[in-house]
């Protein structure tokens, strides 16, 4: 930031806290909302770091109590980092750590390592839950520079099936159900669960869940896809806490040809949204992606007004006509008005875009210097943002479709 640099966080609580600070700092340089495209993938390293720290501390404590050969904390920390790739208490990972400790001269029983592992896992889960609680509470209380609104935040998640990513998702959902004080439902962050065939969905899993839904809710069914149980938990959370919303990555317009389930960076090819409305994916000037991009401007069309004007004009043109003739004429007038208005809006948005390009990079120090906007990191402070914004979108929206139909047809 312009006030100093921040070191890489070393615990899940620090990861979550810095995520809120990033939201707030970025909010102060823009209008509207912002979104993290792969929250589970980004928070997962914090879970693993927390687990390794607890594993290190508990092993040191055990060796200190029992006496005998032990290692310096820095040595043991490095050993754990090298031999513990996951929080999952699988035989391979536990065996690797046990063998490495014995090779270093640390006398510790295999069963002791398993107990320590379970204890470190439980402690990490509790801290992850607290981190997600803090994340939610902070985003519903900390204000942006405007002072009259909390930071408008969104997080997308659902496709990280690593044990660490799954823990983040599960504890975020749990903290969302718990809510704020006095049972208040948290409004922020807006949450979007990404549903993907082979990751969190399959027809086989759906059939198994429907067959015995009570067992599915209780987590007593082993599903084929790794995150189908989290999809069920997400649906349960939505039923009581409004969020998450759901994004279906297999819809034809949401697919990316480069997405592969074995790619650790697959989240780069997943569409993400801001809130319940802003989808940025296709790109006229580069690869389609939601990363480092956003909506630059939007203008909404007032459909009821156009419909009312169309009915009045049609009535004047056919003063003695029946309602069907008037409606037919009004429909044509209305559709032509929509075309003309959309063209005018496009011209207005482009004119504004040309002005937006003249802004200087130093007006957005955090956003540009950290490459939050794709390409912003290459700019000097007094450079115009210019082509950095060409990856953004211009939005033509509308409001009142139902009311417009009532105005023309007398019914919705």
Regions found by a protein language model. Give the residues of each.
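Contiguous, well-ordered alpha-helical segments that form the cores/surfaces of helical PPI scaffolds
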Residues: 394-407
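Conserved catalytic cores of very large enzyme subunits
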Residues: 1-391, 407, 411-412
């Amino acid at each position: 930031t312009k006030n100093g640099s921040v070191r890489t966080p070393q615990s899940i609580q620090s990861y979550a806290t810095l995520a809120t600070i990033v939201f707030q700092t970025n909010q102060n340089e823009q209008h509207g909302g912002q979104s993290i495209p792969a929250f589970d993938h980004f928070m997962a390293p914090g879970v693993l770091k927390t687990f390794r720290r607890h594993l290190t501390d508990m092993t040191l404590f055990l060796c200190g109590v029992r006496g005998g050969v032990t290692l310096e904390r820095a040595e043991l920390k490095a050993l754990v980092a090298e031999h513990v790739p996951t929080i999952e208490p699988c035989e391979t990972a536990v065996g690797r750590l046990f063998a490495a400790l014995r090779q270093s001269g640390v006398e510790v029983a295999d069963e002791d390592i398993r107990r320590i592992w379970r204890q470190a896992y439980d402690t990490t889960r509790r801290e992850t839950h607290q981190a997600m609680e803090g994340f939610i509470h902070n985003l519903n209380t900390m204000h942006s520079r405007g002072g009259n609104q909390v930071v408008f935040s969104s997080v997308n998640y659902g496709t990280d099936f690593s044990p660490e990513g799954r823990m983040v998702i599960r504890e975020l959902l749990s903290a969302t159900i718990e809510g704020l004080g006095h049972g208040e439902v948290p409004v922020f962050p807006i949450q979007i669960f990404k549903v993907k065939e082979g990751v969190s969905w399959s027809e086989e899993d759906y059939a198994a869940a429907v067959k015995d839904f009570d067992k599915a809710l209780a987590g007593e069914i082993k599903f084929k896809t790794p995150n189908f149980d989290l999809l069920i938990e997400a649906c349960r959370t939505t039923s009581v806490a409004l969020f998450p919303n759901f994004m279906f990555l297999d819809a034809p317009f949401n697919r990316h040809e480069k997405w592969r389930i074995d790619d650790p960076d697959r989240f780069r090819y997943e569409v993400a949204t801001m809130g319940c409305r802003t989808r940025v994916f296709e790109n006229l000037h580069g690869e389609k992606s939601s990363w480092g991009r956003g909506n630059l401007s939007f203008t909404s069309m007032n459909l009821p007004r156009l419909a009312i004007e169309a009915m009045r004009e049609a009535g004047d043109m056919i003063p003695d006509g029946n309602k069907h003739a008037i409606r037919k004429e009004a429909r044509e007038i209305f559709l032509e008005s929509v075309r003309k208005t959309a063209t005018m809006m496009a011209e207005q948005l482009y004119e504004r875009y040309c002005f937006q390009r003249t802004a200087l990079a130093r007006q957005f120090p955090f956003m540009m210097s950290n490459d939050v906007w794709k390409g912003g990191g290459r700019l000097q402070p007094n450079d115009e943002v210019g082509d950095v914004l060409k990856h953004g979108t211009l939005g033509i929206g509308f409001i009142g479709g139902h009311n417009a139909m009532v105005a023309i047809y007398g019914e919705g």
